[in-house]
């Protein structure tokens, strides 16, 4: 019975490359000359440092641009609040989301069941497994999910025949 998994996961290698490119651009840009603006990464947590709120916005724009160039969807980013750290300096924690959350998984299962396509959807940890008898049914489920779920980037992998 053919099946596939619906997952939501950013390519962390591309995220790391985008951070390195962002830091390189920030270090060479004239408007950041003499400032302590940078982006640091620890696992799935990014920390943006800047001298003030305006420069923090600039750092964020540079990072988003580099992520977009490397085909990493910016909807994976979850921005924390801006914190003041000593003097005028500010930082912001940005987490990279991973996995299909419980609410989103329930929404996906509900959409699949309401579509009346002859497939079964089940939640398995951070993924939703969709299984059916025909490959065409699975392809129509993929098209339907791409159209209906727009708030979170979805990937489809682990295709089995």
Curated annotation (Swiss-Prot):
GO terms for molecular function: nucleotide binding. Keywords: Nucleotide-binding. Pfam families: DUF520. The keyword Cell membrane does not apply. One of its GO terms (cellular component) is cytosol. It comes from the Bacteria. PANTHER family: UPF0234 PROTEIN YAJQ. Nucleotide-binding protein. NCBIfam families: PRK05412.1. Belongs to the YajQ family. HAMAP family: YajQ. This is Nucleotide-binding protein Bcep1808_2648.
